[in-house]
Amino acid sequence: PAKLPLNEAIDEYIVHLKGENSWILGRFIIPISQFKDLEEFLPLFDSLGPLRLSVLGGGGKTDDEYLNNIKQNIADINDFREKHSGKIEIDVIECKLATNTPSKSIMQKATDLLNENDLKHFHEFAELPYVGIDYSTELDETNWDSEVVSTVAMISKMDNAGIKLRCGGIVKDAFPSVEKVAAMIQACSLNKIPMKFTAGLHHPLRHFEE
């Protein structure tokens, strides 16, 4: 659905909701910036129950900008919740970090705000560094441990938090290497933090030679 126009994505989602395999269907994922576009389709769910949403937010170039974006995201979410009470449920937000090494105090403030507003949260790294092991010393000679592992460990201490890993897209950098995927799974497993994968299904190949 992510590569379809919103009306087609909604139509397809409803078809699957009415199908025999609806039990496996997750939340409909949408950027917060598209809330207004979504409104016209909400009556389609009157007979299906509330539309369950996972929303995309966060981002920014600095920690302070990230926190301000989170505050605005929460305000927009609560406005949408109030306006369409009983028709939608928003209980998950996926947030892109501003940097790979965010301030602990900023992250604590952001996650506290998200928790206070009944939102589980998955955090996506700004840009994953290269994973490289020197097999003679078994040491990682890159920034993976100092940036990614330390940040995963920090976020794992925060309530209702998870890690998001992008696994596909239309550019080369959107495809993590096998080593990055394995290292991220290991980091999340060791720190006992939930993780989710995204984008791998609708963009399995970044280029077609046509």
Residue ranges and their predicted role:
Residues 1-105, 113-126, 139-144:
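Alpha/beta catalytic barrel-like cores
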Residues 146, 153-160:
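Extended repeat-based interaction scaffolds and adjacent low-complexity, acidic/S/T/P-biased segments
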Residues 160-210:
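Catalytic alpha/beta core domains of metabolic enzymes, predominantly
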